[in-house]
């Protein structure tokens, strides 16, 4: 208590030297009383040290628990968000791929079955014997060569550059078989009405029914029915079966020339029956084509549904975690 009063603070470093310490005067009670006071002070010092240690331990434990809870909550939230995002992305990719593959497989299988059905009924309905079974045993048939019932023409040279430089609404049909054989669209119109086109080179022998304004490239042959006994649609269905049989495959590129097309012989029932059969087959063909066009749209719709439900479930899980963390902190 007394020593600090004699410290020399005038120096840069405060000090209490030995000579000054020796000069400090102190008052003492009897020895017995000194010993009692010293014992009391020692006890008090020990109790203070114990109390300080206990308080320090308690505060450290509380602080550690609070910090641990906060850090755990933050870390848990961050990890949960990161893992959930990664998991969601992975699941979304996997499920989308699986769904797309499954849908494509299912719809493609259905399409193949429809095409098989169509081919079966087309061949059945165009067979002379079956036509007589359905419409009567005495149904007469007439046989013609294509040149006897049709005007036969060929398309003209139409380049891709010409199509780019002359844009319009009228399709240009070529030797391609995808996209209904359409190469592009221009403002010109070489044909207008009901026609049949066929591919002369490359994928030779593929037949299309046309109705409206269009153009044909030089790799396309064009037929215009001139005989009133013949239904153009019915003729197109007959040629879809018969024309491929006359394709010349010995050359480097398969061909079905105008000359060969002109010589093909076909048999026809009366016009009324031709029209009935053609209407049935045309409706069936349209159904198959609609299914082909509908596959990508169906897959896209299912993907959107999948994304919606994935997002809904992900947000719901996140909300539940937030509520759980809030409850634990409170």
From Swiss-Prot:
Disulfide bonds: none
Highest taxon, organism lineage: Bacteria
Gene Ontology MF term list: DNA binding
Sorted UniProt keywords: DNA-binding, Restriction system
GO annotation, biological process: DNA restriction-modification system
SUPFAM superfamilies: DNA methylase specificity domain (SSF116734), MgtE N-terminal domain-like (SSF158791)
Transmembrane residue ranges: none
Induction section of the entry: Detected at low levels after 6 but not 96 hours growth (at protein level).
InterPro entries: Restrct_endonuc_typeI_TRD, Restrct_endonuc_typeI_TRD_sf, Type-I_RE_S_subunit
Family: Belongs to the type-I restriction system S methylase family.
Domain notes: Contains two DNA recognition domains, each specifying recognition of one of the two defined components of the target sequence.
Primary role: The specificity (S) subunit of a type I restriction enzyme; this subunit dictates DNA sequence specificity. As the bacterial DNA is methylated on this sequence and this is the only type I methylase in the genome, it is probably responsible for all of the methylation on this site in the genome. The R subunit has multiple frameshifts and is probably not expressed in this bacteria.
Protein's recorded name: Type I restriction enzyme MpnII specificity subunit
